[in-house]
Amino acid sequence: MEPVTINLEQATVRFGDKTALDNFTGEFTPGTVTALIGGDGAGKTTLLKLLAGRLRTHSGNNSGYAVDRHNVGYQPADSGVWRHLSVAENIEFVARTYGLSPDKARTRSEELLTKAGLDHVPNRLAGRLSGGMRQKLGVVLATLHQPGLVLLDEPTTGVDPISRAELWSLIAATAAEGATVIFATTYLDEAERATRLFLLDHGTLLGVGTPTK
């Protein structure tokens, strides 16, 4: 894992004449979990895609990105799994994509699947998993190659309480390994899991804080 520190200063992203992210300033550092909080259209996904290197700023003074794609783990809002593949085949595909050795992929996937409570369904098609199980598999796939930057778009949406606890165990373990973890959510109670919070609305940063402030 290569540690990732990103500083954005007055970062702006536009789509045509629409400003999706307006003068965003923030820092993201290794070993932390940052929550992007806001409703639909707040700019959370735009910011995640920017940090992932999938978008470019139209203005701003920024450092630390775009991160090499092999050092990024990204889970989109739809879980990011291939539904026509089994759990094991999803893992094999991602492992090959990032050049993991068979031994490394096996050891790492066994560890993550156990933490996610998915170790009993390796041969099940992802399309036949529950929504919560697919979300957990999405986080497993995003963190399989131990990236320095992990980006999760509403990873707990539609997830039952038990699966949510397993998800947070995965996310906390990823940060403890030294990754810079950033997740988007519409739930204020999710903020308690974060090291730092960014409140967004219509692409504008309204406030920055911690769970205790």
Language-model features: locations:
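Conserved ABC ATPase signature
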Residues: 125-132
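The feature captures the beta-strand-to-loop junction immediately N-terminal to the Walker
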Residues: 37-39
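ABC ATPase C-loop
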Residues: 143-144
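Catalytic Walker B motif of ABC-type/P-loop ATPase nucleotide-binding domains
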Residues: 150-154
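Helix-to-loop junction immediately C-terminal to a conserved catalytic motif
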Residues: 52
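Conserved ABC ATPase "signature" region
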Residues: 92, 96, 103-121
